[in-house]
Design a protein with these regions (language model features):
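Edge/loop elements at the starts and ends of beta-strands within beta-rich repeat scaffolds
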Residues: 1, 23-28, 47, 135-140
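Acidic/charged, solvent-exposed loop-and-adjacent secondary-structure segments enriched in E/D, K/R, S/T
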Residues: 52-84
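A short, polar/proline- and glycine-enriched secondary-structure boundary/capping micro-motif
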Residues: 41-46, 64-68, 128-132, 153-156
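Gly/Pro-enriched, hydrophobic low-complexity segments
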Residues: 94-165
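Conserved interaction-surface patches within small, structured recognition/assembly domains
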Residues: 15-23
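Membrane-embedded segments
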Residues: 33-42, 52
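General beta-strand recognition
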Residues: 31-33, 53, 117-118, 143
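A short, Trp-centered hydrophobic/proline-enriched beta-strand micro-motif
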Residues: 1-12
Length: 165
């Protein structure tokens, strides 16, 4: 299935907008493409749990810190399953803890509708990334916001359609 979103990216006060496309290539790999609204490709990645390949990227975005940050973001966003270590409850959500490498992921499932509404990626001491989801069903989110706390980066994705031909 292809996921197509209108994307707005704010990085250090600079704004980019365009189209974000994520396509599942096989069971483990996704291809992620970000283009301008006119169709010019800004970045093109292939990403899986263990592999990452940059197919193309424009010179202005070709920075190691940005590429590694986007790799982390897209892995969190496109991950199919998590190994849960602990479960917590708060007033609004069931919270599931997963531990990966040097960070923890907290998955917040709404008690009201039983949908994923937030993923928090954190070190032992502080939050690094929050992913917020607004969805109408359990297949895809109509809005996704990726907010960083260690760098000035915010990505907002608004759903356009489910398939492109």
């Amino acid at each position: 299935m292809d996921y197509v979103y209108k994307a707005n990216i704010t990085i250090y006060g600079n704004e980019l907008s365009g189209i974000f496309i994520a396509k599942r290539i096989n069971d483990t790999t996704h291809r992620v493409v970000f283009t301008t609204e006119f169709g010019n490709k800004l970045l093109d990645f292939e990403i899986s749990e263990n592999d990452f390949k940059v197919n193309s990227i424009v010179d202005e975005l070709d920075r190691k810190i940005l590429i590694n940050t986007l790799k982390t973001d897209f892995r969190l966003l496109l991950k199919n399953s998590y190994v849960i270590q602990q479960q917590y409850d708060n007033s609004a959500s069931k919270v599931y803890l997963t531990e990966e490498d040097s960070s923890n992921n907290y998955l917040f499932i709404s008690k009201a509708d039983n949908k994923l509404n937030k993923i928090v990626n954190a070190t032992k001491r502080k939050e690094r990334i929050n992913l917020f989801f607004t969805s109408e069903n359990n297949i895809f989110a109509i809005k996704i916001v990726i907010q960083h706390y260690n760098i000035k980066l915010r990505i907002e994705l608004n759903y356009l359609q489910t398939q492109i031909n």
